[in-house]
Amino acid sequence: MARTTICALATPPGRGGVAVIRVSGPAVPAIARALAGRLPEPRRAVLARFCDAGGDTLDEGLMLYFPAPRSFTGEDVLELQGHGGEVVVDRLLRRLHALGAHPARPGEFSERAFLNGRMDLTQAEAIADLIAADSEASAQAALRSLEGAFGDAVRELVARVTRLRVQVEAAIDFSDEEIDFLADEAVAGQIGALIDQLQALRDKAGQGRVLRDGMQVVLAGPPNAGKSSLLNALTEDDSAIVTEVPGTTRDLLREHLHIDGMPLHVIDTAGLRDDPDRIEAEGIRRARAAMAEADRVLLIQDIREPPIDPAALALPGDIPLTRVYNKVDLSDEAPGPRRAGDEVAIAVSALTGVGLPALRDHLKSVMGYGEAGSHFSARRRHLDALARAADHLALARRALVEEMAGEIAAEELRLVQHNLGEITGEFTSEDLLGEIFSSFCIGK
């Protein structure tokens, strides 16, 4: 528990009806008595005069006291609810500083809550995600993380990994039993179930990252396929210049939109073709770089042309792809979704709008629309940690099932635990904590 006491304005600065100032730390009882002449009963709002050192009133408002450990930070917390004027707030903060409370750093209240065991790191990050949410779906996902859905799923997986690791290490200690244990089909079953559980968690976290950050979709295809027209149709705005001249789009054009509350970042790119001029070649290079970072690529082509081989355009093979056949109004084909094997395709007309509702429904579906209530908020660092854990779990499986190498398997399982623990903050560094909490608001 911290030895210093901190304070900060918890509401937005400026003029308003009410300003909330938060104080946390061991000096809270003394500060309350010096400021208002008394320490309120825990969790009861009382009307109080907030006075300066000479006894003159600085403001009048409500005061609440939350004793440790049952407070947001796990420390003694005092909350002052006064009038929302800049001068009033400034005078109160200067009085608190004089009484020994230091100005809080951004996110320091949440950091103390984490360090004092009031929440794990996913819950602390969810506070910032909830504040920054720009859609109902992302707000709901952040709330589920704040309630512990993500952290609980990680801890359940860690518990199962730990049990298997204990079994492996016990077998190593009794070398005459090690081979029999490692050869047991039940061990292969356990590690297989762990791999499946981890993959399911990665899938959910990936959806959660999309809900938090938005899905990045790149419009790709040959020149004059209608990429810019489709961007304008999706955004319902003339964002992109559209002409009949091939190669009109030379640079990336980014637009942000919501489809029924689901955040989407759409990037229009230069047409992909051989023998471009020097400027167009740079546009194509940027298009390929954008595709490599995308969550999904929409491969757009004229429906009257033969289906394009993605490999012929050197599209990234590891990025999910949806085919969009444009200009259906110029053909005898029916608009809407179609499927060839595992491939999803949708016929549309960016000009007339037919087929666009089906495309929007498809984008909503791949973003997890309708399932948002079961998702939690996730960040890129979470996905990276889960990927590292999956790599080590695969190595542990090989050591256990194929190589009968118990000591190697035990070490790989330890690394799985460590990487999962980085998500919840069980294993972390001061640099990581500083990076996370520095992005928070002051007063949070």
Swiss-Prot record:
Annotated positions binding K(+): 224, 243, 245, 248
Cofactor descriptive note: Binds 1 potassium ion per subunit.
First-tier enzyme category under EC: hydrolase
Sites where the protein binds Mg(2+): 228, 249
Swiss-Prot/TrEMBL keywords: Cytoplasm, GTP-binding, Hydrolase, Magnesium, Metal-binding, Nucleotide-binding, Potassium, tRNA processing
Single annotated GO MF: GTP binding
UniProt superkingdom: Bacteria
CDD domains according to UniProt: trmE (cd04164), TrmE_N (cd14858)
InterPro entries listed in its UniProt record: G_TrmE, GTP-bd, GTP-bd_TrmE_N, GTPase_MnmE, MnmE_dom2, MnmE_helical, P-loop_NTPase, Small_GTP-bd
Protein residues bound to (6S)-5-formyl-5,6,7,8-tetrahydrofolate: 22, 79, 118, 444
Residues that hold GTP according to the record: 224-229, 243-249, 268-271
Binding partners and assembly: Homodimer. Heterotetramer of two MnmE and two MnmG subunits.
Function as written in the Swiss-Prot or TrEMBL entry: Exhibits a very high intrinsic GTPase hydrolysis rate. Involved in the addition of a carboxymethylaminomethyl (cmnm) group at the wobble position (U34) of certain tRNAs, forming tRNA-cmnm(5)s(2)U34.
Family membership noted in the UniProt record: Belongs to the TRAFAC class TrmE-Era-EngA-EngB-Septin-like GTPase superfamily. TrmE GTPase family.
Protein name according to UniProt: tRNA modification GTPase MnmE
Native organism: Alkalilimnicola ehrlichii (strain ATCC BAA-1101 / DSM 17681 / MLHE-1)
Classification lineage: Bacteria, Pseudomonadati, Pseudomonadota, Gammaproteobacteria, Chromatiales
Underlying gene: mnmE
